[in-house]
């Protein structure tokens, strides 16, 4: 069986991930006119720039959908977002600012839940709006086939017939109008935006050029913190975790994770927290650039890692960061449910997240400027009395430290011998000042 269909399978049911935008609207109408039987599936991911989800399936029916369904994906999306925080599943960072993999998380949820809904309706051909140059085409491909082994893929944007007829937004708009739909193109922005409840991605067009900065972006989840005319008063915030799960913000307990994430977004968004500018490596190894928003994820991540550093030992923290980066890359590649990812997730959630209980107090200011004011947890292994510089009972004595330092003589001796060995091999030069070999000065070497 051919998995990827290059041309429209007339007479067959085709499920399309329908956003209600121009691209998917024109594609749905075109498929119906060409003899296919389109079914529309819309994911409610809590997109901050969408205010009427119920209207989207209605529009799909108007454009010729045999059936149209709205799938509420918010609960699952937030669950996966919290899991990513618990595991530190983030591998793209620049200057200490993190991309929280919000688009990959959204694709993991959309790609599985929409295909599961299609399967219920007996629809085994799936199309979406991803292009062949991006990451999403592979993410959706993997998640779709994981969910339905009989799935076939048809994408209008890979069909030369569709491209020849409706290859641009102007052509698609004219097509909709000619078919009796008063569809007006939205005002063109200097970049494109994709969002869900966890975060927003701004990329392409002007943002492909590195001399275009965050200042051309109009945030949809936060504020223009770089604009001095925007007043952003400082705000003290408390975040509480229980066994790795965020349960309270500013003393208010949430039984609904969706409501908790919405409130975290509101709090962080008031300050522009969690915005970052990243150059990243796409799945196909080419570099791309994006500007990201994730105010709620950033707020929870800061509090979680503060508790983490106070509760776990150094080696556990090192493994958390190392395994988290590995897991973040797998998530980015569309492998969130692969066995190697599940193995990493299980270990991080079981042995790291389970102990993260406590409350962190922060002061948020502008953008990613914040201070940690207090950290409280019954699980803290940070105990100031162990290393206090003041007089008092100590857990170890000066004689204990002398013994510990004396034991270091063994590896210091080994290291000294290694340095002289490197010098004999010509890798290091002798220093007249210290008597120890040293790396040759590059400036002197150039002379």
Swiss-Prot record:
Binding site for L-citrulline: 99, 135, 139, 192, 201, 203, 280
GO terms (BP aspect): argininosuccinate metabolic process; L-arginine biosynthetic process; urea cycle
Swiss-Prot/TrEMBL keywords: Amino-acid biosynthesis, Arginine biosynthesis, ATP-binding, Cytoplasm, Ligase, Nucleotide-binding
Keyword Transit peptide attributed: no
One Gene Ontology MF term: argininosuccinate synthase activity
Binding site for L-aspartate: 131, 135-136
Subcellular location: Cytoplasm
EC numbers for this chain: 6.3.4.5
Entry GO CC: cytoplasm
Pathway(s) where this gene product acts: Amino-acid biosynthesis; L-arginine biosynthesis; L-arginine from L-ornithine and carbamoyl phosphate: step 2/3
Origin: domain of life: Bacteria
NCBIfam families: argG, PRK05370.1
Family recorded in the similarity comment: Belongs to the argininosuccinate synthase family. Type 2 subfamily.
Protein name in the entry: Argininosuccinate synthase
Native source species: Salmonella paratyphi B (strain ATCC BAA-1250 / SPB7)
Name of the encoding gene: argG
């Amino acid at each position: 069986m051919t998995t990827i269909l290059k041309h429209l399978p007339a007479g067959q049911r085709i499920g399309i991930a329908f956003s209600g935008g121009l691209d998917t609207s024109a594609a749905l109408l075109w498929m119906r006119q060409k003899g296919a039987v389109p079914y529309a599936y819309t994911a409610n991911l809590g997109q901050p720039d969408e205010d009427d989800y119920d209207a989207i399936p209605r529009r799909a029916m108007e454009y010729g959908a045999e059936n149209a369904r709205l799938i509420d994906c918010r609960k699952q999306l937030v669950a996966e977002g919290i899991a990513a925080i618990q595991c530190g599943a983030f591998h793209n960072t620049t200057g200490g600012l993190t991309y929280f993999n919000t688009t990959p998380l959204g694709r993991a949820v959309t790609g599985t839940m929409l295909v599961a809904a299609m399967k219920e309706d007996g629809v085994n051909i799936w199309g979406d709006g991803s292009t062949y140059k991006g990451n999403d085409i592979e993410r959706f491909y993997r998640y779709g086939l994981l969910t339905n082994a009989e799935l076939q893929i048809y994408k209008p944007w890979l069909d030369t017939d569709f491209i020849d007829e409706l290859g641009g937004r102007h052509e698609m708009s004219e097509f909709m109008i000619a078919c009796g739909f008063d569809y007006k193109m939205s005002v063109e922005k200097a970049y494109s935006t994709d969002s869900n409840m966890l975060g927003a991605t701004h990329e392409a067009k002007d943002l492909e050029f590195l001399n275009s900065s965050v200042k051309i972006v109009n945030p949809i989840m936060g504020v223009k913190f770089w604009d001095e005319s925007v007043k952003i008063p400082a705000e003290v915030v408390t975040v509480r975790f229980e066994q790795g799960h965020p349960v309270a913000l500013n003393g208010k307990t949430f039984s609904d994770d969706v409501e908790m994430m919405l409130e975290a977004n509101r709090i962080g968004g008031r300050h522009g927290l969690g915005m970052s500018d990243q150059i990243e490596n796409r799945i196909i190894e080419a570099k791309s650039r994006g500007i990201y928003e994730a105010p709620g994820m950033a707020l929870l991540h800061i509090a979680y890692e503060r508790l983490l550093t106070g509760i776990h030992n150094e080696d556990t923290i090192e493994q958390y960061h190392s395994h988290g980066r590995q897991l973040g890359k797998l998530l980015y590649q569309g492998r969130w449910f692969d066995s190697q990812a599940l193995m990493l997730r299980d270990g991080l959630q079981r042995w790291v997240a389970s102990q993260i209980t406590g409350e962190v107090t922060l002061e948020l200011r502008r953008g990613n400027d914040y201070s940690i004011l207090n950290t409280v947890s019954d699980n803290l292994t940070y105990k100031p009395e162990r290393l206090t510089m003041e007089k008092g009972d100590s857990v170890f004595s000066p004689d204990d430290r002398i013994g510990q330092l004396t034991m270091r003589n063994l590896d210091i001796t080994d290291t000294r011998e290694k340095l002289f060995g490197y010098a004999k091999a010509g890798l290091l030069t002798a220093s007249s000042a210290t008597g120890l070999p040293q790396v040759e000065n590059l400036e002197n070497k150039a002379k």
